[in-house]
Structure formats: C-alpha cells, structure tokens
Amino acid sequence: IYAPDKKRLFYSYGPSNSFELIDKRPKRLANKRKNNVDTIKAVSYSNNLKPEILKFHKKFKVGNYKKMKSSLKFCVVAAGEFDLYITEPRACEWDIAAGHAIVEHSGGSIRDFNDNEILYGKPNFKNQSLIVKGKSFLDG
C-alpha cells in the first residue's frame, strides 16, 4: 500500500513479514505502541462517527481518533501508530485485501462486529463491518 502524499509504502509477504519501506530499506513492523499506553487511539474514515461505531469506541475505551483516508488506516494500525480502525459495511473485498494481509502478518486481527473472520469470494464482494486491531492492542 503506497500513500504518495505521505511518502509511505507498506507491504507484506507472509506471517511476521509486514514492513514499511523507509529510506529505501525495509523496516519490520514492530507492533509496539507508539502512543501513550493509557490512551487507546483509533483511526476513522470520517469525523462524523455513526452511533454503531461510537458504541465500539466506548466499549474499547477509545481516548481519541483521527480521520484518515485510504487503506493507510490498516497500515498505521499494523505499525502501532493507532490501536483500532472500526467501520461499518461500505467497502468491497478488493478495497481491504492488501491492508488485511499487512495487519494480520504484523500480528493484528480483522474481524466483523460479531467477531467473525473476514472471508473473500462473496457473491456481491461487499465486506461486512470491520474491527481492525493492532497486535499491541490484542496483547495489551
């Protein structure tokens, strides 16, 4: 996943093999929180969070969140810069596949609101709700 305006490139090729390319060198995503351990940070696609999303923010005790566009949301969770990304159904399978691999290969998880695994090859290709958790959040 490449974010040209941020000049950030993330990739993965198997379990424990998620990286960010920094100065032309791969840096393994360490999954260590880069924020205060007392504050749970979430990333969102909107500043106007729907009640269903706010319910999960309350459940997980999210202290603050930041709006961010693109699949970069998955990458910043995998890198430990944010703890969570929670979204309602809106994207198709191809919108999340690369981010899904990067998060899971960094030790994080992606599940739906009912804690089911995210599966691919659905007839309409639409995703369900998503809860993306970084490894540091799962371990914490």
Give the residues covered by each predicted segment.
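Acidic beta-strand-loop-alpha-helix segment within the catalytic core
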Residues: 1-75, 118, 127-140
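Oxyanion/phosphate-interacting regions
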Residues: 54-60, 74-140
